[in-house]
């Protein structure tokens, strides 16, 4: 489906079911080669590239994602994947700041309420995604200050 109107932002981390952290390109390869999808399932990613963190692009914002099938959220949300395992540690501050900025921009662009920034685990309760140590409440607070 082309032309979604996002009402939610869903935050993920890149921890696999086998306990490994994979990078953006490995996720894209898996989604395209193993799953047979046309692109990575997320709309954006945040990963360390060299000495700095960067926002990486995935699917176009108006394309249906493949990141949260529960409650048909793929059809009404943008998916952002933070590369890392946040069951063990908080995201690095520079990566978290990029996520805050990205969420602010998307909330403004699509008039998404801050309370609609959700963790993947909110829909897939059998997961911890985006991690036990991921500061979802802090993310909401930081975005709310600047939206």
How would you describe each model-predicted region?
Residues 21:
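Substrate-binding surface in catalytic domains of secreted glycosidases
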Residues 1-14, 18, 46-64, 68-147:
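Basic/polar, cationic surfaces and motifs that engage anionic cell-wall
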Residues 24-31:
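Short Gly/aromatic-enriched secondary-structure transition segments
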Residues 31-32, 107:
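Hydrophobic alpha-helix position signal
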Residues 35:
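Aromatic-lined glycan-binding groove of carbohydrate-active enzymes
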Residues 38-45:
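Glycine- and aromatic-enriched membrane insertion/assembly motifs of diderm outer-membrane
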């Amino acid at each position: 489906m082309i032309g979604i109107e996002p009402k939610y932002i869903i935050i993920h981390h890149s921890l696999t079911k086998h306990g490994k952290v994979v990078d953006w390109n490995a996720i894209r390869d898996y989604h395209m080669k193993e799953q047979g999808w046309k692109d990575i399932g997320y709309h954006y990613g945040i990963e360390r590239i060299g000495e700095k963190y960067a926002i990486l692009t995935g699917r176009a914002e108006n394309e249906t994602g493949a990141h949260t099938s529960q409650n048909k959220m793929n059809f009404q949300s943008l998916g952002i994947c933070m590369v890392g395992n946040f069951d063990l540690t908080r995201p690095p501050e520079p990566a978290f700041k990029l996520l805050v900025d990205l969420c602010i921009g998307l909330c403004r662009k699509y008039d998404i309420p801050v309370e609609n920034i959700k963790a993947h685990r909110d829909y897939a309760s059998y997961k911890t995604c985006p991690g036990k140590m991921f500061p979802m409440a802090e993310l909401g607070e930081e975005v709310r200050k600047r939206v």
